[in-house]
Amino acid sequence: MFHLVDFQVTIAEILIIIMRTFRIAIWNLDVIISSIVRQLFKPLTKKNYSELDDEEPMELDYP
């Protein structure tokens, strides 16, 4: 039978081996991941106020 705990331990051991191979410390890993996330989502969070100025508000008709 497949044991999920053994699988999780195996993945954790593989990650530790990879981190030791590339000499990545756990406290540096947080900085690396956050910088990657910032670079990926930078285009999504960029605000273009010039495009917003050209829009006109919507008129709502109530019955």
Curated annotation (Swiss-Prot):
Belongs to the coronaviruses accessory protein 6 family. Transmembrane segments: none annotated. This is ORF6 protein. Disrupts bidirectional nucleocytoplasmic transport by interacting with host RAE1-NUP98 complex. Disrupts cell nuclear import complex formation also by tethering karyopherin alpha 2 and karyopherin beta 1 to the membrane. Retention of import factors at the ER/Golgi membrane leads to a loss of transport into the nucleus. Thereby prevents STAT1 nuclear translocation in response to interferon signaling, thus blocking the expression of interferon stimulated genes (ISGs) that display multiple antiviral activities. Residues 54-63 are annotated as: Critical for disrupting nuclear import. Its main location: host cell. Keywords: Host cytoplasm, Host endoplasmic reticulum, Host Golgi apparatus, Host membrane, Host-virus interaction, Inhibition of host innate immune response by virus, Inhibition of host interferon signaling pathway by virus, Inhibition of host STAT1 by virus, Interferon antiviral system evasion, Membrane, Viral immunoevasion, Virulence. It is found in: Host endoplasmic reticulum membrane; Host Golgi apparatus membrane; Host cytoplasm. GO terms for biological process: symbiont-mediated suppression of host innate immune response; symbiont-mediated suppression of host JAK-STAT cascade via inhibition of STAT1 activity; symbiont-mediated suppression of host type I interferon-mediated signaling pathway. Pfam families: bCoV_NS6. May interact with nsp8. Interacts with protein ORF9b. Interacts with host RAE1 in NUP98-RAE1 complex; the interaction disrupts the host nuclear import. Interacts with host KPNA2. GO terms for cellular component: host cell endoplasmic reticulum membrane; host cell Golgi membrane; membrane.
